[in-house]
Amino acid sequence: SKGIRKIAIVGATGKREDHTLGNISLLMEYMRSGMEVRMITDYGIFIPAQDTQTFASHPGQQVSIINFGAKGLKGKGLVYPLSDFTNWWQGTLNEAIAEEFSIYCTGEYLVFLVISDYL
């Protein structure tokens, strides 16, 4: 591994959605192996995470939280409340209300932050 612990992945979304989903799922594997990884797309950033964390944002920023088995999922600094979502779509289309937001839980989840003005 040559001591590399931080990775930014670009070009992982493209013409085939099945390949995109495969690349997104790899983010969780990289995190489990101890890597700090981000996937940068045309519209935002995917960040795999586990347990309680705080994320930089700005008021009005679109945010999605995809649960990968986290328990006790709660949020602070988001428009809509979080819960132990059982389907990926349930945590989509949220919105930050401050310069940061926090996710409180035990377990794994994936954050998507919209960085584009297109949406």
Q: What residue ranges belong to the model's regions?
A:
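Long, charged alpha-helical interface segments
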Residues: 49-119
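Class I SAM-dependent methyltransferase SAM-binding "motif I" and its flanking Rossmann-like core
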Residues: 29-57
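Short beta-strand segments
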Residues: 10-12, 40-41, 66
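N-terminal glycine-rich phosphate/adenylate-binding segment common to multiple enzyme folds
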Residues: 5-16
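Short phosphate-binding loop-to-helix
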Residues: 1-2
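Short Gly/Thr/Asp-enriched flexible loops that form oxyanion-binding sites at enzyme active sites
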Residues: 14-28
